Amino acid sequence: MAEKTANDLKLSEIELVDFRIYGMQEGVPYEGIYGINVAKVQEIIPMPTLFEYPTNLDYIIGVFDLRSIIIPLIDLAKWIGIIPDKSKENEKIVIITEFNNVKMGFLVHSARRIRRISWKDVEPASFSASNSINKENITGTTRIENDKTLLILDLESILDDLKLNEDAKNAKDTHKERFEGEVLFLDDSKTARKTLKNHLSKLGFSITEAVDGEDGLNKLEMLFKKYGDDLRKHLKFIISDVEMPKMDGYHFLFKLQKDPRFAYIPVIFNSSICDNYSAERAKEMGAVAYLVKFDAEKFTEEISKILDKNA
């Protein structure tokens, strides 16, 4: 699905698979509208035959065999914190995804269409105190037709629950004396920021965080006010996610390269999207590396190469 639409995608736009989950709130049924990046979706299948999967995570309801690959199935309604509409019990499909080099299946009620949306129309999520949805699992929102809201999910946090980021958290600090200076990193996922901050801190860097491209540009201005023309001596590189509300990583890099104060700064893309097109696009735009979250050893190797080159 990603390959079919990738060549048409413009800078600062995202294509989302629009899918629905039917829930109940105070006894009243409602339709939840959600989106996931097309680049992360491999296929959509009917409900498969499930096998038991021993886990204490109640939203993992089993595993299934897809062409000899065993894939865990996540009940998205449970994960988000939705009380399901039982009248829709038989209306279920599975969205097969791959991100962070991990395949997973997500149980939803229906997939409607593919939407092309500008990142500037995606806002960070905010909810009323009474809302029952687990707010930590929502990374952004955007308005669609009839003044409805589509929610973009932070699916990366599931990997943390599954302990698939443990290698990053437990990575040994073998270069602390060599690695020093400032690093700016951008990511809208709280889970990804936590993992990255932990690793960079172990490597000896001082860290400035940003939650999207706009915030990243603002943080750069703050660093320039702090260091002036000496910023070059202090800020070693920038690490940026690709998918972010308000301003995505590609547009952030484009803006960066237009500003002579910052155009020299090496930029590493650190993304959950693991397709060749995204990596090639990043290199064409001038990124020094495109990494798939999160391989701690490879990440450290890339940092070492950049610092050696700029020494």
From Swiss-Prot:
CDD domains per record: CheW, REC_CheV-like
Physiological role: Plays a role in chemotaxis signal transduction system in order to colonize the host stomach. May act as a phosphate sink to control the flow of phosphate to CheAY.
Gene that encodes the chain: cheV3
Organism name: Helicobacter pylori (strain ATCC 700392 / 26695) (Campylobacter pylori)
Keyword match Phosphoprotein: yes
UniProt record, GO biological process: chemotaxis; phosphorelay signal transduction system
Keywords assigned by UniProt, alphabetized: Phosphoprotein
InterPro entries, sorted: Chemotax_regulator_CheV (IPR024181), CheW-like_dom_sf (IPR036061), CheW-lke_dom (IPR002545), CheY-like_superfamily (IPR011006), Sig_transdc_resp-reg_receiver (IPR001789)
Domain CheW-like: 13-164
Record carries keyword Phosphoprotein: yes
Disulfide bonds: none
Matches recorded under SMART domains: CheW, REC
Protein name listed in UniProt: Chemotaxis protein CheV3
